[in-house]
């Protein structure tokens, strides 16, 4: 059984994301003094005592206004409560009861999910009890005074949360999920793709750029394998982004790339590859992440039997950083080839984690040398490649021992990398090669020997 879910519910700017960060001991949820910063529901891992659970942060609920994203935010909150064991309802103790709080209470009373009422911004325990007493009238049970920013009362609140969770013996050991980050420019269809993959409205979809302002974690299981999908805020040029929620969301997006096992880079089929797409491709390669390139909105392209081949050639010429990444033409709108994303991503992750024995590596290098010898300088010096070994995975990394790294130019280094890929595979993952000279190797050996003598 998956870990139980705790939903955080409340109107805008009452401190929901601050409480999430407090409960999860992190700063993943964006906190900013602008209402409506959180729009989609986002998940984090929570711990208390010997229990583990998922905390889902929802957007601020507003019932007297249907403009912009507010109806979708209400839908996201309703979906969060459907999967939750308990909903923690946050109100502002300093403001007292508002009409919005009463509307939320009415909304919650029609739901089967149990609720806990947390009165936030009660900085002192004595004043907190007096401030919280007013909220009995909401009909949501005992009000618990807390200060999310200082941690006052949050331990007692968590004790109450645990009473609503299913018994621990109903929870099984969970396999660590594969982290898959869905990244791309604004409005290329990342959230639509996430919803198509999950088969539900997990992320708010809108033609307005910047709808997603935070990273959104979604846990699903495909073919008995757990995945954690992260829909990220659209990444734009820094000079196009004002300081505020979108700025923080983009920083979260780069962090999502860093903590992912595989990135799905979404390209708009109508726009083709832009300069920003190229920068993202470079970031993925630089961070050493496995990758699948997904060309979305394929249904909107006028095409014949040669269009896909021609477009792939054009796209790959511009995404040369990711010439090793598989490319898939999809439509989030129609669902075309969406299921194939998992197969390609799973293969890329497998290759990203793969290790090869030293003997196999050197068989490939021997074959490469037989086809093309290292270059010779005008002075008659020729590069010599003695042997190689894999030193790391995630991404696969190899150290090649040579007489002098300076004798191996970029052209020959690319040739060796191609031969390693052709001989060993590694589709969907970058490969790192480290060229180490004989002098450096001997110096390291001498250092080790000296350390052994001293010990």
From Swiss-Prot:
Coiled-coil segments: none
Cell membrane among keywords: no
Disulfide cysteine pairs (residue numbers): none
Entry binding sites for GTP 1: 10-17, 57-61, 120-123
Protein's GO biological process: ribosome biogenesis
Function: GTPase that plays an essential role in the late steps of ribosome biogenesis.
Annotated family: Belongs to the TRAFAC class TrmE-Era-EngA-EngB-Septin-like GTPase superfamily. EngA (Der) GTPase family.
Full protein name: GTPase Der
Organism in which the protein naturally occurs: Parasynechococcus marenigrum (strain WH8102)
């Amino acid at each position: 059984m998956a870990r139980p879910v705790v939903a955080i519910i409340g109107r805008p700017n009452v401190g929901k994301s601050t409480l999430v960060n407090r409960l999860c001991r992190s700063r993943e949820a964006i906190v900013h003094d602008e209402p409506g910063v959180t729009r989609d529901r986002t998940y984090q891992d929570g711990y208390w005592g010997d229990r583990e659970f998922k905390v889902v942060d929802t957007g601020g609920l507003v019932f007297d206004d249907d403009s912009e994203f507010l109806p979708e935010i209400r839908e996201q909150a309703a979906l969060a409560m459907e999967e939750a064991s308990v909903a923690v309802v946050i109100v502002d103790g300093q403001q007292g009861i508002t009409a919005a709080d009463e509307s939320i209470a009415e909304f919650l009373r029609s739901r089967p999910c149990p609720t806990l009422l947390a009165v936030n911004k009660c900085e002192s325990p004595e004043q907190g009890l007096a401030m919280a007493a007013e909220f009995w009238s909401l009909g949501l049970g005992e009000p618990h005074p807390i200060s999310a920013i200082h941690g006052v009362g949050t331990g007692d609140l968590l004790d109450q949360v645990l009473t609503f969770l299913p018994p621990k013996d109903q929870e099984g050991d969970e396999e660590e999920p594969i982290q898959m980050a869905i990244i791309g420019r604004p409005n290329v269809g990342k959230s639509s793709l996430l919803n198509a993959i999950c088969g539900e409205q997990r992320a708010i979809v809108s033609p307005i750029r910047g709808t997603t302002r935070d990273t959104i974690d979604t846990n699903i299981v495909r073919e008995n394998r757990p995945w954690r999908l992260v829909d990220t805020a659209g990444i734009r040029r820094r000079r196009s982004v004002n300081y505020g929620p979108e700025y923080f969301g983009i920083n979260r997006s780069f962090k999502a790339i860093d903590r992912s096992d595989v990135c799905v880079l979404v390209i708009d089929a109508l726009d083709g590859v832009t300069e920003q797409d190229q920068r993202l491709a470079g970031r993925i390669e630089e961070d050493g992440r496995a990758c699948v390139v997904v060309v979305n909105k394929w249904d909107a392209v006028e095409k014949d039997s040669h269009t896909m081949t021609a477009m792939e050639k054009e796209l790959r010429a511009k995404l040369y950083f990711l010439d090793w990444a598989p490319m898939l033409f999809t439509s989030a709108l129609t669902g075309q080839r969406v299921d194939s994303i998992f197969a390609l991503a799973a293969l890329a992750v497998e290759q990203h984690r793969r290790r090869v024995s030293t003997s196999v590596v050197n068989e490939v290098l021997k074959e490469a040398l037989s086809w093309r010898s290292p270059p010779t300088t005008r002075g008659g010096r020729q590069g010599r490649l003695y042997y190689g070994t894999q030193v790391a995975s995630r991404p696969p990394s190899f150290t090649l021992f040579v007489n002098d790294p300076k004798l191996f130019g970029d052209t020959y280094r690319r040739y060796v990398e191609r031969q390693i890929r052709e001989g060993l595979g590694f589709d969907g993952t970058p490969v790192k090669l480290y060229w180490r000279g004989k002098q450096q190797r001997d110096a390291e050996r001498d250092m080790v020997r000296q350390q052994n003598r001293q010990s």
